[in-house]
Structures are given as C-alpha cells and as structure tokens.
UniProtKB/Swiss-Prot annotation:
Keywords: Cytoplasm, Glycosyltransferase, Purine salvage, Transferase. Pathway: Purine metabolism; AMP biosynthesis via salvage pathway; AMP from adenine: step 1/1. Catalyzes a salvage reaction resulting in the formation of AMP, that is energically less costly than de novo synthesis. It comes from Actinobacillus succinogenes (strain ATCC 55618 / DSM 22257 / CCUG 43843 / 130Z). It is found in: Cytoplasm. CDD domains: PRTases_typeI. GO terms for cellular component: cytosol. Its EC number is 2.4.2.7. The gene is apt. It catalyses: AMP + diphosphate = 5-phospho-alpha-D-ribose 1-diphosphate + adenine. This is Adenine phosphoribosyltransferase.
Length: 180
C-alpha cells in the first residue's frame, strides 16, 4: 500500500500563494489526470469501508463528487449529492456553516436519507472540518447516522480530524500535508 500512497501523494501538485498569498493549494486535479493514482485513490477508500455496513455515500460539492461517485459504484451503494443552494431540483433541507470569512450553506434532497442509514461522507480534503460537520447535521436531521468520513488529503494542522472525532466521526485520510 505504501507504493500506492506514495503515488497518490506525488500526484498532488502544490500551488503556492493560491488562491491567496500564504496559502499552498493542494491540487487534486493533477491526481485525476494520472489513471493509476486516481484508481488507487478510489480503491483504497472503497476497501477501507467495504465491511463497515455503509448504506449510502455522500459527496460534497464539488470535489467530493469526483471521489465519492466512483467509491459508491465500487461498493454498489447509492451516491447522494450535497450541493450549494439552488442546485437540487426536489425538496431540500439546508444547513448553514461557518467559513473563515462569513457563512455558507449546503443542501440535500429531503428524501435522500432514511432513518437508520449508515452514511459515509467523502470529500477531497479535510481542513477545519466545517463542510463535513454541515453534512453530518444534514444526515442526522433526516434520521441517518455518520460514523465515518473519508478524504484524499488531510491538513492536520487545521484541526479538522479532532473536530470530527469530538462528534463521534472517525476520519479516514490517505495523505497528509503540513500547513494550510
């Protein structure tokens, strides 16, 4: 597995001072351009959750879709989209969450999760955990449960893993990068 993780990590380009000065952007689009790295990413996440009793997978807009959908296909599970406001056609419920400077909102179809669903949340990157926390609240409001969340990249210095663990959610990450 170390060869696969090395391939994944080396496939992620680091872009300094993007989107603003002092930030190092971890670009997963470079990973998706390398089929072996993309396949390894999907397979490692899928295998980590194959026997965890997951009933549905949620992907967060938009990069969570890139990894969540193929993992759902690999596991033969429904894939649920969590989107920004106004993007879903049926009845939705919304959840606000805090950003570094302001607030944002996520939505899910009101009929997407049923009572007792064991939901895995997938996103590309774990930073502060705010986006995933909003997803957890959406799932809980619909009667589902989130015990696991999966990410390609972890930025441990930003505390997202600890934030999720305090809510009883165990984060699974493939590669760590220092900083923010």
């Amino acid at each position: 597995m170390n060869k696969q993780l090395d391939l994944i990590k080396s496939s992620i380009k680091s872009i300094p001072n993007y989107p603003k000065e002092g930030i190092i952007f971890r670009d997963i689009t470079s990973l998706t351009e390398i089929p072996e790295a993309f396949t390894a990413t999907v397979n490692l996440i899928a295998e980590a959750f194959r026997h965890k009793g997951i009933t549905k997978i949620i992907g967060t807009e938009s990069r969570g879709f890139i990894f969540g959908a193929p993992v759902a296909v690999a596991l033969g599970l429904p894939f649920i989209l969590v989107r920004k406001p106004g993007k879903l056609p049926r009845e939705v419920i919304s959840q606000s969450y805090q950003l570094e400077y302001g607030e944002d909102k996520l939505e899910i179809h009101a009929d997407a999760i049923q009572k007792g669903d064991n939901v895995l949340v997938i996103d590309d990157l774990l930073a502060t955990g705010g986006t995933v926390e909003a997803c957890i609240k959406l799932v809980n409001r619909l009667g589902g449960d989130v015990k696991h969340a999966a990410f390609v990249i972890n930025l441990p210095d930003l505390g997202g893993g600890e934030r999720l663990r305090k809510q009883g959610v165990e984060p699974f990450t493939l590669v760590d990068f220092a900083g923010h």
